[in-house]
């Protein structure tokens, strides 16, 4: 099975119901991808993720390049074999981590020199090197290297970064044409442009000329408001081809997911459900539960009485509070399982609403309960 993306239905809001076929299975879109930074979604086994219905997860090129190394993973049969995950995987290029985690980085048109956050060793990541690593990892969907900038940034700074990202996209396309396999991996270009809608549109137009099989929108939700993220996403998607999948990187909160979908987004990822779970923040159909609060000390109810996850079918808030306060590993396991289920359940609801042309009603109801 190679790659094929089809839009099955379109909602009056502009949201798309789709299906993305990959060599490791079908992804029903719009889809949310749990983040498995170092080839693991923290506190979940692969069997847990399969039981949750995860069709695709994200892993991180920067972290896997530094440890255990892409050559080792390649020699172990690639990332799917190495982590024993039979379904689809997306890897980012490592660009965001280089700019957010690394010290003493230096960016030129050739690439970026940086020091590892692990041991201080110096590394150089070019568009070609990023793809060399991603091809070795063997994920289904891979990203070009992009330059991420802080938000907000001056327009000239955003314009320079967008131009460099576009040049890197051209080089990535050329490298993949020589060394990649389009039947096994799908290469996405990334739209940049800071918080400037016209720059986003220009960058998207130029990127589309390179004819990528899919497109991501990067550099958002890194300090800017939800409204700005939506405005920049709208500017980009207005220029992207309707027959290609669109991926909004690094978003978002549960109540925001329908907003992004109405802008024509097909895929999203975020560390929020897993990171929040490890800090005792649980998402429910009536808002957040901070499980450490004393009010839950003798609460026999599940986290969410309307939730169908295995945790809510079995455990009480009182027990989960006890586990969290005692520092038990099981707290992170159960909390994470619930939060991922909650996100995936929202996505199931979104897809069903699009199918019947009722996404606006679904969005209004969800946001009324969660905000």
Identify the residue ranges that each predicted region occupies:
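C-terminal extensions of enzymes
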Residues: 1-19, 27-31, 42-43, 146-152, ...
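Glycine- and acidic
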Residues: 151-154, 159, 214-220, 329-332
